[in-house]
Amino acid sequence: MEPRFMGQLPELMKNYKAEETEIIAGLQEKLQEVFQKAQQMQKVDRKGKICTMGVSYLQSSVLTGSYDLRIDLYDKEFYLDSAECCTYWKPEFIARYLLKDVEYFKNVIRFKVPQIKAYEIQQFIDGYLLNYMYLLVQFFQQILPQVLDKTKMLFQEAVEENMTVIFGEYMGKGIVVVGEKEE
């Protein structure tokens, strides 16, 4: 499992570097879209200032193989914020490698263990997915501060100065990737 991921990593990083400008521009576009939605909601008093941005992977997205990430903006109420404000972004630069690995493992596992059940394969994939999620955490820790600086300049009045960004499973526990970590 690990050798497969580690074997893919150099090619993934090389392709990321080659496509970095487009990847960041795509993310920037999605962030501007969701911050614009938040700003419109604030103008009609449906949402407070944005305190937290959640970037989440969705179990439904894992099951369908689309591997989209959901980007949510929350006011001070966080998960209790009833005014939903979100968009979706697919990190293609990672998803294509993950899809290749999933197909590879499905074939290898079915060949070696013919009686394996679909849910057992899915459990394996869920565990393997963590390799790529950790890679996304590192990506967001590096890229988001500069991308958010540009976005926050455009939407200053909509965002708290010390906005936090968390990454994790949707509505689950997350890792702080930008901002203050609470003790």
Task: Tell where the protein language model's regions lie, with residue ranges.
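Aromatic- and glycine-enriched beta-alpha-beta binding-site module
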Residues: 44-102
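Acidic, proline/glycine-rich low-complexity IDRs
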Residues: 1-4, 126-183
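Short secondary-structure junctions and interdomain/linker hinges
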Residues: 34-45, 62, 105, 112, ...
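Generic hydrophobic secondary-structure signal
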Residues: 27, 31, 53-57, 71-73, ...
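Low-complexity, serine/threonine/proline-enriched polar segments
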Residues: 84-131
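Short, Lys/Arg-enriched charge-dense amphipathic segments
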Residues: 34-46, 65-80, 108-112, 127-128, ...
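Conserved aromatic-histidine-acidic binding/catalytic patches
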Residues: 15, 19-26, 124, 128-136
